Amino acid sequence: MSAPLASTPAFNAAELARVVAAAPHRLLFFGGATAVLLSMSWWALVLIGQRSGAAAMPLPLLPAGWAHAIGMQYQALPMFMFGFLLTVFPRWMGLKAYTRWHYLPVGGSLLLGYLLFHGGLLGV
């Protein structure tokens, strides 16, 4: 006989936030992954709107290709780079590891800037 399946615990946002904020690479990689997924969703909606002829998305002030290039190059990619660098620089330079108060403002500001950028593209 097999043992009964253990019940899946309920989603706990506080626990997720604690785990994500436990190290610089987790926070910034999470922000970068979120940025990439949001960009893919936005880009898919833009392309579907252009292909179908329906006005599914408000037209951004920038051409969609330029907005994609700016968002990926200057906002999504730096989150991955900073996540890596904030994790390895202390070890490479013989410094003590950063505390949460060093990298939480960095990750939060980068993600907030990215969300505001996409909010502007959506006309919010």
Describe the residue ranges of each PLM region.
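Hydrophobic alpha-helical transmembrane segments of multi-pass integral membrane proteins
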Residues: 1-124
